[in-house]
Amino acid sequence: MSLPFVYPAWLKPGDLVYVVATSGALRNLEAMEKGLDIWRSRGYNIAFSQYYRSKWGYLAGTDEERRQSLAQAWGDPDCRALLCARGGYGSSRLLENWQWEKVAPKWVIGFSDVTGILWSLARIGISSVHGPVLTTLASEPPWSQRRLFDWLEKGQLEPI
């Protein structure tokens, strides 16, 4: 069975991307800053969801705070992509009674615990990227970083 997918608009320098923390609380701010530096060096504008630095136990805020952050970024008409800050645990809890607002689709980028969010988008036919979260991006080899941006900016992937 083949699912028809809608691809969000390809990104370009000057686009606004949001940092969202849907899973574990941020623990390594240095790694996050390095990831942000990569996005900024490519000309992207960065916004931070309201609760991205919150902490509730091991999570990046309560379920409601994290859900509001996700909704804030998804609903912002100027936002072109959501950069998940890190994985861990807790994203699937946000999907209980969750409905994606019907807006122009945006890229959601992450892996690990974020996979549930990516699958929920796939179920409604929106493509996303199972790729580095913000706190792991700088530790990816250059070829991996290049492939991420080749896809997000041009929709092209060269064979490995």
Name these PLM-found stretches.
Residues 28, 90-92, 117-118:
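Short, well-ordered alpha-helical microsegments
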Residues 98-120, 127-134:
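Short, acidic/small-residue loops that bind anionic groups at enzyme active sites
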Residues 81-92, 111:
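N-terminal glycine-rich "phosphate-gripper" loop used for MgATP/nucleotide binding
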Residues 94-95, 120-123, 140-143:
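Short acidic, glycine/serine/threonine-rich loops at helix termini
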Residues 1-78:
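ATP/NTP phosphate-donor binding region
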Residues 42, 73-75, 94, 120, ...:
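Hydrophobic structural segments
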Residues 59-60, 93-98:
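Metal-dependent catalytic neighborhoods of phosphoester/phosphodiester hydrolases
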Residues 126-160:
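Conserved anion/nucleotide-ligand pocket segment
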